[in-house]
Amino acid sequence: MDIFTLLMIAAGLSMDNFAVSLASGCNPNIKIKDISKAALLFVAAHLVMFSLGWFGVSVIAERFDAYDHWISFGLLVFIGLRMIKEAAAKKGQQECVNITETFSRLLLIALATSMDALAVGISLSLAGVHFVLSVAAISFFVLITTFFGFKIGGKLGDKLGIKAEIFGGIVLIGIALKILLDAMM
């Protein structure tokens, strides 16, 4: 596999966390340390899932493949509905939820957005792609897209307020549906 293809796979893999970061960046009170914490946790979750896929190809592929899409779907729908519910409960307030406020929320989002990395780890391992190069590409894209997502979301958040949070919840549910439909096709 050529480097360009690997970079495109890494970029595609990072789009889920970009969408979450974009929607969550609308919180005007989010600090750079919170963004850094989210970015590092997103990278760590992607690397763990990618490594599980890479090194556990024969064991995990057979046992986990049957329901990984259901786990991703369930987590993303749960988080998406929760974001929409919290936004609707604000009754006109212009503050977005800080996904970094609680570690459990951030961890759930990191795990939900990294499920695809398991399948990518399996695929790239079977394709014979270099592990360190794959890890470097994925880490780079997840880190950069998370930071840019939060920053762009921060610029749009002043104008969008609660609408951005509702949109973020809808985006998560859309990603969940896409994961489920892709798995069923």
From Swiss-Prot:
Probably functions as a manganese efflux pump. The chain crosses the membrane at residues 3-23, 40-60, 64-84, 102-122, 124-144, 165-185. This is Putative manganese efflux pump MntP. Keywords: Cell inner membrane, Cell membrane, Ion transport, Manganese, Membrane, Transmembrane, Transmembrane helix, Transport. InterPro entries: Mntp/YtaF (IPR003810), Put_MntP (IPR022929). It is found in: Cell inner membrane. The gene is mntP. GO terms for molecular function: manganese ion transmembrane transporter activity. Belongs to the MntP (TC 9.B.29) family. It is a multi-pass membrane protein. GO terms for cellular component: plasma membrane. The keyword Transmembrane applies.
